[in-house]
């Protein structure tokens, strides 16, 4: 499971001209799911994201977490995070999980964030979405559950 995390001042996702999810300060999380992912991967990423210390404290140091600042997450499913661009000019998406496997894990990830006290807004799984945000920093991180310690 792969997450691209962008610290945002505000963000929203629109489907068919209608806003379906919006947050003020927090993270936009683009989440990609692969075939081997499980609910353990979802829980690992949720725990990591809820506690990442990338918000500034009173001294201007990145020392506060999403929970510390009362931030929210705008969670957007993104199968293209598993695009393989090594060969040719068209990405290969064979590593991305099919919807019947990915949707329950996407929902488990969002539920795991909520269980940790994070307010979560979402896009629409599988839909064409317009995502807009005001980057804060910018701060952008990539976390892959396959790279967690003890998993090498």
Swiss-Prot record:
Entry EC no(s): 3.1.1.96
UniProt keyword list: Cytoplasm, Hydrolase, RNA-binding, tRNA-binding
Major localization listed first in the record, in broad terms: cytoplasm
Reactions performed catalytically: glycyl-tRNA(Ala) + H2O = tRNA(Ala) + glycine + H(+); a D-aminoacyl-tRNA + H2O = a tRNA + a D-alpha-amino acid + H(+)
InterPro entries reported for this sequence: Daa-tRNA_deacyls_DTD, DTD-like_sf
Family matches, as Pfam families: Tyr_Deacylase
A GO BP entry: D-amino acid catabolic process
EC supergroup of this enzyme: hydrolase
Motif Gly-cisPro motif, important for rejection of L-amino acids: chain residues: 137-138
Subcellular location: Cytoplasm
Molecular function in Gene Ontology: D-tyrosyl-tRNA(Tyr) deacylase activity; Gly-tRNA(Ala) deacylase activity; Ser(Gly)-tRNA(Ala) hydrolase activity; tRNA binding
Lineage top rank: taxon: Bacteria
Cellular component terms (Gene Ontology): cytoplasm
Subunit structure and binding partners: Homodimer.
Domain notes: A Gly-cisPro motif from one monomer fits into the active site of the other monomer to allow specific chiral rejection of L-amino acids.
Family: Belongs to the DTD family.
Function: An aminoacyl-tRNA editing enzyme that deacylates mischarged D-aminoacyl-tRNAs. Also deacylates mischarged glycyl-tRNA(Ala), protecting cells against glycine mischarging by AlaRS. Acts via tRNA-based rather than protein-based catalysis; rejects L-amino acids rather than detecting D-amino acids in the active site. By recycling D-aminoacyl-tRNA to D-amino acids and free tRNA molecules, this enzyme counteracts the toxicity associated with the formation of D-aminoacyl-tRNA entities in vivo and helps enforce protein L-homochirality.
NCBIfam families xref list: D-aminoacyl-tRNA deacylase
Protein's UniProt name: D-aminoacyl-tRNA deacylase
Taxonomic source organism: Geobacillus kaustophilus (strain HTA426)
């Amino acid at each position: 499971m792969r997450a691209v995390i962008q610290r945002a001042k505000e963000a929203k996702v629109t489907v068919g001209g209608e806003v379906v999810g919006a947050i003020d300060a927090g993270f936009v999380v683009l989440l990609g799911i692969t075939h081997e992912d499980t609910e353990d991967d979802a829980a690992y990423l949720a725990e990591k994201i809820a506690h990442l210390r990338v918000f500034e404290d009173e001294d201007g140091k990145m020392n506060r977490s999403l929970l510390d600042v009362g931030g929210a997450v705008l969670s957007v499913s993104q199968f293209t995070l598993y695009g393989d661009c090594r060969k040719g000019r068209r990405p290969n998406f064979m590593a991305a999980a099919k919807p019947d496997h990915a949707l329950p894990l996407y929902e488990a990830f969002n539920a795991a964030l909520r269980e940790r006290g994070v307010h979560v807004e979402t896009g629409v799984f599988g839909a064409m979405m317009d995502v807009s945000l005001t980057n804060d920093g910018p701060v952008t991180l990539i976390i892959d559950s396959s790279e967690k310690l003890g998993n090498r």
